[in-house]
From Swiss-Prot:
A Pfam cross-reference name: G-patch
Nucleotide-binding found in the keyword field: no
Cell compartments where the protein resides: Nucleus
Protein name from the UniProt record: Zinc finger CCCH-type with G patch domain-containing protein
Amino acid composition bias (Polar residues), ranges on this chain: 486-495
Organism field: Drosophila grimshawi
GO cellular component: nucleus
Entry function: Transcription repressor.
Keywords associated with the record: DNA-binding, Metal-binding, Nucleus, Repressor, Transcription, Transcription regulation, Zinc, Zinc-finger
Bias-annotated ranges (Basic residues): 499-508
Sequence ranges assigned to domain G-patch in this UniProt record: 313-359
Length: 508
């Protein structure tokens, strides 16, 4: 528009200067066109300005309307939130009031094991959590804190220090339970123990010294004294058969085997087609295998694998057992509660009675190889016998006056003995003979004292035949040695007397 005005100004100046009529007409026509163009331009700008102002006015109104609507929506949402919060608080208070009335009550609460299995156990409600939860159906609920009364695993065992309020660890760091949080909707009625249904082979839970409840089976029941003898499952217990009072037992009346059998009977009665029956049987078999696998987690894990000897064979035994439905790691039998460790053959000592074998087993004091006691005794006896033989051989090689006297007195050939005796005794001096005489006299007195002690022992133990036999043997040995010593003393005295008489004969 400024350009048009500048052009109009130039045209007007040219009209003032130009005198030519033709040029003035052209310039006049050009001025008229420029004026019309300027007028049109000004009118279009005015309309555009009006439109812009109108649009701005309409935009401001729309924005104001939007802000007003958003404020209304915010107010509605705030009111809804306040209403929901009020409803949640009211519902939370109602749930708390409902569950606070159950504090201290017994119930049956679920417990999820570390391997994913879920089972119900008797528990005691000890608290209500402050937070609301939403279950799978979208319903608000509250979690309850429960303590299990029959814990079967360490993570279920209540902490004694927590119960007394003195535990220094929090719920995560403590090895024992500070209470399990379970949804209130999952709580069931308390399963009270019925001791009247206790019978032989009835499954029970028994409380041991570790405060855990172990599975076992009833052997016999005494309802008068309220005691029950139970055989504990597994082989980690040294004493598998124990007596428990009723307070330390919990009967397991509803067994899983009965549930599986009832489910199978119902499925057979309700299903008509063979395909449906087959599918039900497959489900039951899968459930049985799952239960067997779960049961294997509770059983004792032996160090020796069942069927480990088949590494030297073709393994036909394990293949046959697998075809019959055996699952490795579980016990024998249809319910998987049989033995897990294979029975090993025990070689008894030859020529020994069963009573002697039992005595050896008691002497071993729980040793696996209790016949090692007998081997140790025999080994010590052989060592002692070998030592005695070596000592006897060493003593037999020694040659002294006593050996000479024994040979001279106890020899078989009398003539040769007398000749040797006289010749050998004549080789010793009088001093040596006197010393030997004193030694033999001391040995004779010592043997006489030993014989007197043995005779006193015989008189004191006249009723014990075995001891009498042994003492009589000792007495005979002492008497024989005494006779030998007396014979040696007699020989020495004769030699000394001979020498004295010779000295008298040569004395003038």
């Amino acid at each position: 528009m400024d350009e048009y005005e500048a052009q109009l100004l130039v045209v007007e100046q040219a009209l003032l200067v130009t005198t030519d009529e033709q040029q003035r007409e052209e310039l006049s026509a050009l001025r008229t066109n420029l004026e019309e163009l300027l007028a049109l331009t000004r009118s279009s700008e005015t309309e555009a300005t009006n439109n812009i102002s109108t649009a701005q006015t309409n935009g401001d109104l729309d924005d104001e309307l939007k802000r007003f609507q958003s404020e209304l929506n915010d107010l509605k949402e705030q009111e809804q939130e306040e209403t929901d919060t009020t409803d949640d608080k009211q519902q939370l208070e109602e749930l708390r009031a409902k569950y606070n009335a159950l504090l201290g009550e017994k119930c049956s609460a679920p417990h999820e094991h570390s391997w994913g299995a879920l089972s119900y156990h008797n528990a005691l409600i000890c608290g209500v959590d402050d937070e609301l939860i939403i279950d799978g159906n979208g319903i608000l609920d509250v979690r309850l804190r429960v303590l299990f009364t029959n814990p079967t695993h360490r993570e279920m065992l209540p902490c004694n220090y927590y119960l007394e309020g003195e535990c220094r660890f929090d719920e995560i760091r403590c090895r024992f339970s500070h209470g399990a949080l379970v949804p209130g909707a999952s709580i069931k009625e308390y399963n009270a123990p019925d001791f009247h249904k206790l019978a032989r082979n009835c499954p029970v839970l028994a409380k041991l010294q570790d405060r855990l409840w172990h599975r076992g089976r009833v052997l016999c029941v005494n309802f008068v004294e309220q005691q029950c003898r139970v055989r504990l499952d597994g082989q980690e217990h040294k004493e598998r058969e124990r007596d428990f009072p009723f307070e330390e037992l919990f009967p397991l009346i509803a067994d899983e085997d009965d549930e599986l059998s009832s489910d199978s009977s119902e499925s057979h009665s309700t299903e008509d087609s063979d395909a449906a029956n087959d599918s039900d049987m497959d489900d039951l078999e899968a459930a049985r295998q799952a239960r067997m696998v779960e049961l294997s987690l509770f059983t004792f894990k032996p160090t020796e694998k069942l069927g480990a000897w088949e590494q030297y064979t073709r393994g036909i035994g394990s293949k046959l057992m697998a075809n019959m439905g055996y699952i490795h790691g579980t016990g024998l039998g249809s319910d998987g509660r049989g033995i897990v460790t294979p029975v090993s053959a025990q070689i008894l000592p030859q020529g020994r009675s069963l009573d002697a074998c039992m005595e050896l087993r008691e002497a071993a004091n729980g040793d696996k190889n209790y016949f090692s006691v007998e081997r140790k005794l025999k080994r010590a006896q052989r060592r002692q016998q070998a030592a005695n033989e070596k000592a006897y051989a060493r003593e037999s090689k020694r040659t002294d006056v006593f050996a000479f006297l024994n040979g001279s007195v106890l020899g078989q050939a009398q003539n040769s003995t007398k000749t040797t005796k006289t010749s050998n005794l004549q080789q010793h001096s009088n001093k040596t003979l006197n010393v030997e005489t004193v030694r033999i006299a001391d040995d004779i007195r010592r043997k006489q004292r030993d014989i007197a002690k043995v005779q006193q022992s015989l008189a004191r133990n006249a009723t014990d035949a075995q001891l009498q036999k042994r003492l009589n043997g000792q007495l005979r040995a002492h008497q024989q040695e005494l006779a030998t010593l007396q014979a040696q003393e007699s020989s020495l005295s004769k030699e000394q007397q001979t020498r004295k008489s010779k000295n008298k004969m040569f004395a003038f």
